[in-house]
Structure formats: C-alpha cells, structure tokens
Amino acid sequence: MEKDLSREAYYYHLPEENIAQKPADKRDHSKLMVLNTSTGKVEHKIFNNVLEYINPGDMLIVNNTKVFPARLTGHKESGGKVEVFLLELPTYIRPGVSESIALIKSSRKPKVGSTLTINEALSCRVTEQLAGGKARLQLHYDKDVDVTEILAGIGEIPLPPYIKREEGTTPEDVTRYQTVYANVPGAVAAPTAGLHFTEELLQSLRENGIQFGEVTLHVGYGTFAPVRAENIVEHNIHEEFVSVGQETVDKIIATRKAGGKIWAVGTTTVRSLEFAAAQHGGQIAATEGWCALYIYPGFKFQVIDNLITNFHLPDSSLMFLVSALCRREKLLECYQMAIKEDYRFFSYGDAMAVISGE
C-alpha cells in the first residue's frame, strides 16, 4: 500500500507515436480494452462492443458538460500579440459586461487597467493579477449581444497541450472534441471517455434496457496540472463545479434496488457521483457545489461499480483514481499491454472499461 502512495510508482514510458493527435475515423470504432478486476482477465475489443458488457437493468451515467470556445487571440495596447485562455465561462455583470478568470500569454504581462483587444466586437480589461499567471478580466462587448454568441464566433476550442499539430485547431475539433450529449457549456477540456459514444450506440443501449443519467462537472484547466508531491496524498487536487440532479439520484437508487450496476463514463463522472455521496454521509443525494474530491488507492467507492475511461498521463491524478478501482500494478500491466498492441493514448485515444465482474 505504501508504494501505491508514491508518485514515481505510477510512471510509465509512452512512445510519442502512441499519443493520439486526432480522433478515430468513427467515434465508436476506437479500441476498447476490457479489464475484469475480479478475474484479472483482459480482452481487446472495438468500442461499440461495450454493448456486450452493459446488462439490461444497468445504468450508464455521463457528464453532459460542453467545452466552450475559450481560446482567444488579439493584441495589447502596444500592438503586441496576446493569447487569452478563459478558464471559466464569463459571468454576466450587466448588459455588455461580463467577468472571467484567464491565463494570458504574451511577451510581457499586461498591467492592471490595460485593455486587450480581441476584435471590434470584444475587448478585455485586466482588473486584477492573480497567482499562477492568471488574471481577472472584464469583458466588454455590445450590450445587445450575448457574450457566448461572440465567443462562438471568434473563440477556438482549446485542445490539450499534448496535442501538437502544425495546423492547430481544425473545424473537425469543433465537433469531435465534444461529446454527442454535451449540453451545459462551461468546460475548457472535454470529458474524453464520452467521445467514443455515438447517437446510434446510445440508442442501442436504450433498446437493450439500459438506464441513463447525467451529471455536470465543468472540466477545468487544473485537470492538466502535474502532480509534484512525491507522496501523492500531499497533492492539492483542483476544484471543479459539480451538479448532480434529483432525477439521476432517483434512477441510481432504483437501479441499485433492482440489482443493476452503475457505470460511470469517465473519471469526472466518478468524482461527481462520489462527491455527491461524500457530502451526504456516503448516501447519494442531489448536490451542487465545488468539488475537490481526491480519489487514490484506499478510497471506498459508495456509488459506482464500473468505469469507462481513456488511457491517462503517467503519474497523473487520473491514474491514481483508476488504480483505486483496479490496483496500480494491474493498471500499469494493462498500459504496457496497450502500448504493445498500439492503443492510442490520452484525449483522442482509445478506451478502457474497468468492470467488477461480480
């Protein structure tokens, strides 16, 4: 157990060619590794074969957050180029004015009070410098226009830092770096396990008697923050906004009573559900708030049985979470197997199903 708490125990070497730089040709044609934690058996499938494992009466829960066009480019008062990465959806202040927190990339840090011009429709005034290279911004635009409409027209979908392509963000990313069920804007990164689902696959699951539920967790930039603490317990996990509604809670309780399994699509869904239970003495209940739940080996899951996830970065908090379900040694063994079998890793990569098999 002591080794499970050492950051370096989660390191593995990943060849560059295994980092997916673009999505699979079809969402549900990516590879799927299936790990049964009860038997240790590993199977290699195509993602739409997930139908073979989710039984009638089980419940599949997804994160419905939607990535918003958070990356903006413009210029400073001096004329120098500036890149603004909004870390949260702008908050309405009054007509024509909203506020947000952003990372600002430029040759020199803009001063408080300075204006960053994105285009003729949008400018940003720096109102406060914050820690970690962040700044508080006031966004100014036409009072008859919604700021989200402006962002949709001029902003770019932010891709993770390990997607390095000469062409940058493409029109394909606008749809493919978004789940088909995304409907609540607020994330700066996609809940990537959900990228494998198509409308047709979801319909097939419904026809098979699978229940569905939704949660909202707005994935923040902190999801890419490296773990620096040698002992993973000392890592400060990032906060993200979570909402778990009563309808989803009622379905979970009914599924449990009927003997069905709870499937979480993605680590963000796991955190949302387990946070909702932790807030209420281990019993799932409707919850809304800021989640800083940190899951690593030794954690006792109260809600979920099975997990669909992607392959994660070495020694990352997401690896810790998956290891809490399937043992660190087994996870690393699966990752080595995935590299050998040419699986694609990270956001646009292939998937893994971790099932209890009981």
From Swiss-Prot:
Keywords: Cytoplasm, Queuosine biosynthesis, S-adenosyl-L-methionine, Transferase. GO terms for molecular function: S-adenosylmethionine:tRNA ribosyltransferase-isomerase activity. Pfam families: Queuosine_synth (PF02547). Its EC number is 2.4.99.17. The keyword S-adenosyl-L-methionine applies. GO terms for cellular component: cytoplasm. The keyword Methyltransferase does not apply. It catalyses: 7-aminomethyl-7-carbaguanosine(34) in tRNA + S-adenosyl-L-methionine = epoxyqueuosine(34) in tRNA + adenine + L-methionine + 2 H(+). It is found in: Cytoplasm. PANTHER family: S-ADENOSYLMETHIONINE:TRNA RIBOSYLTRANSFERASE-ISOMERASE. Monomer. NCBIfam families: PRK00147.1 (NF001140), queA (TIGR00113). Transfers and isomerizes the ribose moiety from AdoMet to the 7-aminomethyl group of 7-deazaguanine (preQ1-tRNA) to give epoxyqueuosine (oQ-tRNA). Belongs to the QueA family. This is S-adenosylmethionine:tRNA ribosyltransferase-isomerase.
